[in-house]
């Protein structure tokens, strides 16, 4: 099912099989585990180039944020500018890097009761916005993780629908996104050999 959703939303590229991936989100340990899993799928989470690092560091992100790749942004970072900081981060990655794919992952439960604002609408807006600002530049996937809380699941359904309407495949876990990207890469490699 992961692969079918990816093919429904993304067109395989014959000229550039997917290998280089940027992970961006609030994960901590999740990002580390995902990096290992992606590597086992032959998807590289390599450090970003100096130009990208400089652009991200120029955003003056709060302490605790790592921008090397994965771009690990704690909740307080993603709450900056009411979540609009995600748009600036994505813009910096798109304008200074050439990843084959970007996977944005958000743990919805981590935002619950953390601060006076809920940045999720603006985080989703940032994901949707890059589809029109940088069309075809990199495959883009969204991972929305939750703990099964009914209210969170309702919000997750709403965010999933918005993303899908913009052509963004949405997964429950990073491993699902990695498997989908692997399927895309296999088709791209086949097309490249035709």
Where are these regions (language model features)?
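Short glycine-cluster motifs
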Residues: 17-115
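Peripheral docking tails and interdomain loops at the edges
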Residues: 1-46, 118-194
């Amino acid at each position: 099912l992961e692969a079918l959703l990816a093919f429904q939303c993304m067109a395989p590229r014959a000229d550039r099989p997917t290998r280089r991936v940027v992970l961006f989100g609030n994960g901590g340990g999740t990002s580390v585990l995902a990096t290992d899993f992606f590597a086992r799928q032959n998807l590289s989470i390599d450090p970003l180039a100096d130009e990208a690092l400089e652009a991200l560091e120029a955003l003056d992100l709060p302490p605790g944020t790592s921008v090397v790749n994965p771009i690990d942004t704690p909740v307080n970072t993603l709450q900056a500018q009411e979540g609009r900081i995600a748009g600036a981060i994505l813009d910096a990655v798109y304008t200074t890097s050439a990843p084959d794919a970007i996977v944005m992952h958000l743990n919805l439960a981590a935002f619950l009761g953390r601060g006076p604002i809920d940045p999720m609408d603006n985080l989703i807006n940032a994901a949707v916005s890059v589809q029109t600002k940088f069309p075809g530049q990199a495959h883009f996937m969204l991972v929305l993780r939750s703990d099964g809380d009914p209210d969170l699941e309702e919000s997750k359904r709403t965010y999933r629908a918005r993303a899908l309407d913009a052509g963004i495949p949405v997964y429950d876990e990073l491993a699902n996104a990695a498997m989908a990207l692997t399927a895309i890469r296999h088709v791209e490699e086949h097309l490249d050999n035709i």
